[in-house]
C-alpha cells in the first residue's frame, strides 16, 4: 500500500503502519483528541489532519511533527439531493439542535474516591477554566505530584490501574466540555425549541426534547437542514 487512511485515530493501525514503514493518514473530526496517545502521534509514519486549528498547534508544540490543520469537508451535491418530506419537517424542524454525547462519567469516578481537598482543587480548575475562553491552562495545573497523590488514593481504595497525567488532563477537559454543553442547552431550552440527539438522555437537561439517535447518512442531514441553528 502507498498509505492507510482512517477517520479519527487508531493507535493499533498507527503501530502496525510504523512497524511496516507505511504512511498512516488520520482525518480527525473530534476535539480535543486524546493526548495520552502522544507516542503514536509522534511516529514518523503517522500523519494527523485536524479540523481544530488550536488543537493542531498544541500537538505541534508537543513535538508531534506530522500534524496539519484541515477544515472539515462536506458533499453539497449529495446533501442537496436528499428529499425533505412533510413528515420530516414535523419530525426534525426546531429552533436549535445538538447531536452528540456528553462526557460525564470518568471524572466522577476519579473524584468519588478522593478526599475533600483534592476534590476542591480539581473543581476549582474546572470552574476557572469555564470562565476563561481561548486559553487552556488545565495542563499547567495538573502536576506530577498531584498525579502521584491521585494514584495513591486509587490504590488505597483498591482500584486497579494507574492514572497518567495526560489521561487526567484529557478527562478534566471532557468535563469542561460536558458542563458547557449542559449549561448552553439548558439556557436555550428556556427560550426556544431545542432538539437533542444522542444514545442516552442526560438527567441534567431540562426543557429539552430528547430525540434519540440520528443516523449519519439518512437522518443527520435532515436535522441540520431543518434546524435554524445547530450547536456543535
Regions found by a protein language model. Give the residues of each.
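Extended catalytic core of nucleotide-activated donor transferases of GT-like folds
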Residues: 1-61, 78-84, 210-230
Amino acid at each position: 500500500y502507498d498509505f492507510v487512511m482512517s477517520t479519527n485515530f487508531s493507535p493499533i493501525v498507527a503501530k502496525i503502519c510504523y512497524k511496516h514503514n507505511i504512511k498512516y493518514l488520520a482525518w480527525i473530526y473530534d476535539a480535543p483528541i486524546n493526548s495520552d496517545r502522544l507516542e503514536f502521534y509522534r511516529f514518523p509514519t503517522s500523519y494527523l489532519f485536524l479540523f481544530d486549528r488550536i488543537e493542531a498547534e498544541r500537538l505541534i508544540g508537543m513535538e508531534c511533527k506530522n500534524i496539519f490543520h484541515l477544515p472539515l469537508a462536506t458533499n453539497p451535491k449529495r446533501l442537496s439531493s436528499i428529499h425533505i418530506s412533510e413528515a420530516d419537517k414535523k419530525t426534525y424542524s426546531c429552533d436549535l439542535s445538538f447531536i452528540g454525547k456528553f462526557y460525564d462519567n470518568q471524572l466522577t469516578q476519579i473524584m468519588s474516591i478522593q478526599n475533600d481537598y483534592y476534590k476542591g482543587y480539581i473543581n476549582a480548575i474546572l470552574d476557572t477554566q469555564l470562565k476563561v475562553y481561548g486559553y487552556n491552562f488545565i495542563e499547567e495545573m495538573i502536576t506530577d505530584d498531584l498525579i502521584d497523590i491521585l494514584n495513591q488514593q486509587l490504590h488505597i481504595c483498591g482500584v486497579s490501574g494507574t492514572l497518567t497525567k495526560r489521561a487526567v488532563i484529557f478527562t478534566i477537559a471532557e468535563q469542561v466540555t460536558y458542563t458547557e454543553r449542559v449549561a448552553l442547552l439548558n439556557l436555550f431550552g428556556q427560550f426556544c425549541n431545542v432538539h437533542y440527539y444522542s444514545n442516552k438522555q442526560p438527567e441534567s437537561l431540562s426543557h429539552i426534547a430528547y430525540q434519540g439517535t440520528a443516523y449519519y447518512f439518512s437522518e443527520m442531514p435532515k436535522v441540520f437542514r431543518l434546524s435554524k441553528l445547530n450547536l456543535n
